[in-house]
A protein has these predicted regions:
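A short beta-strand submotif of the Rossmann-like class I SAM-dependent methyltransferase core
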Residues: 131-134
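A short acidic, Gly/Pro-enriched loop at the edge of an enzyme's catalytic core
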Residues: 119-129
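N-terminal auxiliary segments of SAM/dcSAM-dependent transferases
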Residues: 1-22
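Conserved beta-strand signature within the Rossmann-like core of class I S-adenosyl-L-methionine
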Residues: 155-164
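A short glycine-rich, Lys/Arg-flanked "PGG" loop and its adjoining helix->strand segment in the class I
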Residues: 142-154
Length: 186
């Protein structure tokens, strides 16, 4: 049986980490992987993954697009993409334990990598990218939006969430405005 408050302990550990240190994050997710989905559904509220895919589907009708889920974790976005009829999506995460769970969720390919580094992807390799739950406390800063732009084809879609607690302090507001003013995206 999973402790009712254990997920909050893991989440608090992430909030306190603030270091953008992948080794610290890997340690937390290694321990949390088995209970992650339960904790998101029952304690933290899984809303961003299904909502992100729902909004994506309102604009994208081509189910054959090549998609990458950056920071795929246990594959919550992948499960929603699969429900929506998409079948050509890959995932990348820093945690092998999370990827092991994601293997059951329709991904074409899963691999280890971190958005804090260059992703093992070609320039313009994907039609779309998801990055849900990654831009948050102690994970990844705003400068890494450039890496998502690099791997998505011109005219492609990048669907991401940002924790409101880091929107200003991690520089997302200014980075998004800069990318818009430079016509990198709209």
């Amino acid at each position: 049986m999973i402790e009712n408050n254990k997920g909050l302990k893991f989440y608090d550990n992430l909030d306190l980490t603030h270091s953008h240190n992948d080794e610290d994050l890997q340690d937390v997710y290694k321990e949390w992987a088995a209970a992650y989905d339960h904790d998101n559904d029952n304690l933290l509220g899984t809303v961003s993954q299904p909502l992100s895919v729902q909004i994506f589907q309102e604009y994208i009708k081509d189910k054959s697009l090549r998609i990458i889920d950056v920071g795929c974790g246990t594959g919550l976005v992948g499960a929603e993409l699969e429900k929506g009829g998409f079948s050509n999506f890959d995932g990348i995460d820093i945690s092998q334990e999370m990827i092991d769970i994601a293997k059951q969720r329709g991904y074409s390919k899963l691999f280890i990598g971190s958005l804090n580094d260059s992703l093992p992807c070609e320039n313009n390799e994907y039609d779309a990218a998801f990055c849900v739950g990654v831009f948050t406390h102690g994970h990844v800063g705003s400068e890494r939006l450039d890496e998502l732009v690099r791997i998505v084809k011109p005219g492609g879609i990048i669907c991401f969430t940002i924790n409101e607690g880091v929107y200003e302090s991690y520089g997302f507001n200014s980075k998004i405005k800069k990318l818009e003013s430079e016509n990198v995206w709209k």
